[in-house]
């Protein structure tokens, strides 16, 4: 047989691998091993031919230990020489060797044809050992891709002993003993593992030829079908879709439950009625509003009473009025009297930077109220979300109001839920919100009158220790225009001031101090004043006081002081004797004259060039009053009975010029009246100014005495530090040359 016929070319190997892809590991490994051993067989036969022809190969070199060196590579095997036969008969030796060579070639071909048969390999190993070629046994056994068995391992161990690799032979023997002991326990398992893995499974350094190695990898070309490609894309798209959905849902969950957006959820805004002890008896000064809300309480307590007669209570109640009049207190009292849950929110709590949060909070609030009906929903500062809509506004800006309108329409009239809103600007609310069917009942909570103020003062005075001289009625008459909150603050300020003075009770002087602080501002006792500035302030306030005292139709004088309060160096305060709901033209002119009194007094004393900027606030107030007379009250002869205040820009320039000129004329006329009166009352002006310099603060009765030149039973006082002004102040020496008023005597 020609050895070259069994050589396997790379092209043939590649084609076979492509055709037999399912059996790629076994077929590929067998072909590679057959190719390698075909090359070795060709050289082996050449060696035997040279030996038979009488040409001996060179002798092997021995190492220093005397043992023959053996290499597992093909080159070392080709150059090696088998040891001489041990028989002495040369002819017999030559015959046996020749026979052995022929048999070796035959057995090698059989072993190469069936590399997966351990029996064929064992027979070839035995023949090699008989021919004294142990190095070929070792080289072939260690070649990947050749089958092995315990018998082959024993022959391999014997070959290792012959070539002097005793340590490796001992390792093989130890592995055989281990395999035999495992076979005693489970023979089927041991035989199965031996047949499948062979010797190479017992040595980690050796690899399995069926799966290739890093040194000799298997090159594979796989042709995928259309179904495989489509299925792979579907798999990746499915995985990508699942991951995308999971990520989006996770992000949504995180954003909805983190601190940043957790506030978008409406918390439980209900108030435990057991902890709300506010009743209608605690609400004073607004009897009419309380009577309106008593109907709501009756409905919440017994709704069947109204259902039987077909009556329907309003779905919403709107409380309007100035700040501090008790709108929130009325809503709490309504819930306390009815004994139902009370939900409250401010109008500004609905909207945030995120779009849609306001509408969601409206829905959640009403859902909570429905689940705990009967209940009351109170929305304070309703104008924050219920303002008039503008077609130019963005859609998201109207979502909260639209949702509120829907919730109000969705209410059942017998559901036991009442919504109460409160606002200081009812004119700013959207008309759709206040129409019948929504906030269809409007309750005006106005400022208390004198009787209401007295009731409020009595209610708050129950909590403090009062002196016998305290009369709430007198305080009520002296505090017109004060709201319930301001009256409560007045009582508290008086009690605190009495404690600071170590008083055993709160008397009228403490209430007067608290009233002055609220009406005129806090005293600025630490302010440093020049003598000229203090004197100018005294004449300025004296001018106001003289005009208020001697002008027909002016509001009665309350107090005048040159003690700095708030932002003013001095103040002249007027209080009406009764609550006023309207004003006449004569009273408006009197207001103008009183405002002009301070400026004219400074002009009369110091000249026009030395008037101060303290007149600015007076002129602002006078201009506002004069403009209202012309544009709102119809008190102008030139303009006539026309209201110009609304849509001022829509009026013609001529009408507006006439109105402006009329305002200026009213102010000039008032200035002339004030100049005539102060010139006439010049003595009283100087007396009152001197009295203010000496006593700082004078009430209406004391002002009357000072103007008449009477002696005051009062200590002189100067709260602020007074220093000498600079020489550049032209007012410094003005008035010093005039004689002192002889009636102003030291107390």
From Swiss-Prot:
Polar residues bias located where? 66-80
Q: Name one GO biological process term.
A: protein import into mitochondrial intermembrane space
A Pfam family found in this protein is AAA
Outcome (variant: residue 381 to Q): Does not complement a YME1 deletion mutant, no longer binds or degrades COX2. Probably has no ATPase activity
Q: Which SUPFAM superfamilies does the entry link to?
A: FtsH protease domain-like, P-loop containing nucleoside triphosphate hydrolases
Query: What is the reported phenotype of gene knockout?
Result: An increased rate of escape of mtDNA to the nucleus, no growth on nonfermentable carbon sources at 37 degrees Celsius, a cold-sensitive defect in growth on fermentable carbon sources, lethality in rho- (cytoplasmic petite) cells. Decreases processing of ATG32.
Localization (cell): Mitochondrion inner membrane
What is the recorded membrane topology of this protein?
A: Peripheral membrane protein
Under which EC number(s) is this enzyme classified?
A: 3.4.24.-
Q: Which cysteines are joined by disulfide bonds?
A: none
Q: List all Basic and acidic residues biased stretches.
A: 51-64, 728-740
Q: Metal-binding as a keyword?
A: yes
Locate the residues binding ATP.
Answer: 321-328
Q: What does the subunit comment say? A: Component of the mitochondrial inner membrane i-AAA protease supercomplex composed of MGR1, MGR3 and YME1. Interacts directly with MGR1.
Protein name (Swiss-Prot/TrEMBL):
Mitochondrial inner membrane i-AAA protease supercomplex subunit YME1
Gene expressing this chain: YME1
